[in-house]
């Protein structure tokens, strides 16, 4: 046993010596390599499954719209850093929310759909087009707090705007040609700049009185009788109140005096 100890010791010493004399230490850069984030300044989104019911025609139309948008972005080279996955058209997969993380704009207009529940988890959207459909339930949009632009004109029987109450970042909202009467859910959307409410059932403008950043407001074709709530909207530049048979001419004149820089469009006969 005693004769083996120095041999082992010598072998270790030689091994260590070889490491010092023949192998140069690797250079370590003081600057870490740059890493391209998927989306800057945005916390990671928890993966959730998005279900498209193959027996639900509305779901299939929404899936197709998402697919079209993904393909367009892929063709434009916008998916190169994110590994965007295209949904197989006939596979009807369980799509993960992370797969469409890059979608900030989606057009599902003119599809004659009523059920928009598949949009619930796409809360990263900034612009959403849902014009010319049959939507009456907006609850799937309640968590879409990143939306800047929402287009809902031409849905006919849409009345309840309460699911929009927390969309505080909205800048543009199209609601023309619906059946909206109650504007109270919009009272807290103080970042709105462009609001289109033509051809609805609106008769009370009080909820709009605090929307100080409104620049364009279209109220034509409603049941309004006074414009007093708009008197303090100092940034308002364009107001349409044409086709408002219950609105007296003197209301228009009073508002014009209060907001001299606002162009008010109205029927000459009023």
Model-derived features: positions:
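LRR N-terminal entry segment and analogous cap-like coil->beta motifs
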Residues: 45-135, 148-149, 153-157
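Short, low-complexity, disordered segments immediately C-terminal to signal peptides
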Residues: 22-41
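Bacterial signal peptide processing site
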Residues: 17-21
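Conserved "Asn-ladder"/turn position within leucine-rich repeats
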Residues: 111, 133, 155-156, 178, ...
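Conserved hydrophobic beta-strand positions in leucine-rich repeat
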Residues: 50, 104-108, 128-130, 148-152, ...
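Leucine-rich repeat
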Residues: 100, 119-125, 141-147, 155, ...
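Leucine-rich solenoid repeat scaffolds
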Residues: 222-270
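The feature encodes a structural signal of leucine-rich repeats
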Residues: 94-95, 113-120, 135-142, 158-165, ...
């Amino acid at each position: 046993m005693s004769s083996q100890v120095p041999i082992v010791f010598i072998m270790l010493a030689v091994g260590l010596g070889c490491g010092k004399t023949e192998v140069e230490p690797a250079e370590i850069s003081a600057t870490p390599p740059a890493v391209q984030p998927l989306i800057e300044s945005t916390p990671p989104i928890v993966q959730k499954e998005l279900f498209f019911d193959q027996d639900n025609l509305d779901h299939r139309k929404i899936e197709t719209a998402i697919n079209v948008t993904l393909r367009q972005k892929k063709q434009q080279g916008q998916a190169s850093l994110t590994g965007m996955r295209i949904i197989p058209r006939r596979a009807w997969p369980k799509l993960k929310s992370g797969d469409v993380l890059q979608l900030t704009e989606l057009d599902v207009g003119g599809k004659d759909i009523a059920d928009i529940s598949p949009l619930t988890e796409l809360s990263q959207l900034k612009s959403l087009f849902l014009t010319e459909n049959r939507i009456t339930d907006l609850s799937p949009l309640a968590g879409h707090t990143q939306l800047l632009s929402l287009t809902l004109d031409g849905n006919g029987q849409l009345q309840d705007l309460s699911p929009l109450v927390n969309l505080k970042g909205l800048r543009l909202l199209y609601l023309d040609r619906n059946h909206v009467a109650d504007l109270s859910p919009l009272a807290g959307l103080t970042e709105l700049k462009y609001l289109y409410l033509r051809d609805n059932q609106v008769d009370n403008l009080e909820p709009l009185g605090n929307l100080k950043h409104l620049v364009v407001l279209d109220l034509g074709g409603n049941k309004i009788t006074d414009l007093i709530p708009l008197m303090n909207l100092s940034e308002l530049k364009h107001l349409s109140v044409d086709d408002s048979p219950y609105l007296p001419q003197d209301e228009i004149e009073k508002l014009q005096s209060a907001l001299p820089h606002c162009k008010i469009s109205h029927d000459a006969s009023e």
